[in-house]
């Protein structure tokens, strides 16, 4: 089976690729190496935020996209799967969906639902957004709120999670459905996060 893993979070995709290769699958990891962590990858999509870095990233991405066709499975690490602002992701996602058989959406790292549930409802005693009953208002917590709430990243996350052609594996379904169930019970959400399943 041909498998493409896009994005990285704590070396999850590279480790998964090693295991899948041992089972005889053809696996390609395309990522930026999880930013400063520099994890291994087959296709380097690191993005340095300088003029030269932007040009280099755009060139490497445009050269890589035609090679990202014909896979049996493409797994995205999360809705923002490249080191890039959310807006271009929708076009890259549409391209990947058009030229590959199956898309699987991971729920690794931050996303809109994680931020919303943990910030507003605090189902866990400790999270990125609360310590016990005390809501974190420090710069680190607020940065994630600013990225994921009321933004293009939120809209991208909702679009991918609701796309009928995107599969969400069982572990990630649990993450998305748990968030949906908590939001629904609280009255913060009136319709399911996922329409595909």
Model-derived regions: residue spans:
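N-terminal subdomain of nucleotide-sugar transferases
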Residues: 1-38, 42-43, 98-102, 164, ...
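Short N-terminal targeting/anchoring amphipathic segment
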Residues: 2-6, 66-89, 102-106
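Acceptor-binding helix/loop patch of EC 2.4 sugar-transfer enzymes
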Residues: 41-42, 105-151, 192-194
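Short catalytic/ligand-binding loop motif for oxyanion handling, primarily in non-cytosolic enzymes
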Residues: 12-15, 36-40, 82-85, 111-116, ...
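Conserved nucleotide-sugar donor-interacting segment of glycosyltransferase catalytic cores
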Residues: 83-121
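Glycine-rich, highly charged phosphate/nucleotide-binding loops
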Residues: 46-67
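Membrane-proximal helix-turn-helix segments that form the acceptor-binding/catalytic region
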Residues: 65-69, 91-99, 127-166
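Conserved donor-binding/catalytic core segment of Leloir-type glycosyltransferases
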Residues: 184-197
